[in-house]
C-alpha cells in the first residue's frame, strides 16, 4: 500500500515539476501567496500523500485569484 501511495505522489508531482521547469519561467510571477502554489502543492503532496495533499493543493489554487487572499500561507 505504501508503494502505491508513493507512486501516486510521484505521478502527481510530474506535472507540477513540468510546470515549474518549462512554463513558469515564461510567465510573470502571479501567485499571491508565499510559498507559491506549485511549491505548496509539492510540499502538501509529500507531507500528506495523494489524498489529502491533492485536496489541499486544489483548495489553495482555488483561493489564488485577484479577489482571494494573499500573504504567507504554509502547508498545515
Curated annotation (Swiss-Prot):
Transmembrane segments: none
Keyword field: Cell inner membrane, Cell membrane, Membrane
InterPro entries: Membr_insert_effic_factor_YidD
Subcellular location: Cell inner membrane
Membrane-related topology note: Peripheral membrane protein
Cellular component GO terms held in the UniProt record: plasma membrane
Family per similarity comment: Belongs to the UPF0161 family.
HAMAP family tied to this protein: UPF0161_YidD (MF_00386)
Matching PANTHER family: MEMBRANE PROTEIN INSERTION EFFICIENCY FACTOR-RELATED
NCBIfam families: membrane protein insertion efficiency factor YidD
Function: Could be involved in insertion of integral membrane proteins into the membrane.
Name assigned to this protein: Putative membrane protein insertion efficiency factor
Species, as recorded: Porphyromonas gingivalis (strain ATCC BAA-308 / W83)
Amino acid at each position: 500500500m505504501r508503494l502505491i501511495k508513493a507512486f501516486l505522489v510521484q505521478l502527481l508531482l510530474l506535472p507540477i515539476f513540468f510546470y515549474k521547469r518549462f512554463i513558469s519561467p515564461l510567465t510573470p510571477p502571479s501567485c499571491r501567496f508565499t510559498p507559491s502554489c506549485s511549491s505548496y502543492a509539492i510540499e502538501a503532496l509529500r507531507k500528506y500523500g495523494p489524498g489529502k495533499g491533492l485536496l489541499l493543493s486544489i483548495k489553495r489554487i482555488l483561493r489564488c485569484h485577484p479577489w482571494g487572499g494573499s500573504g504567507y500561507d504554509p502547508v498545515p
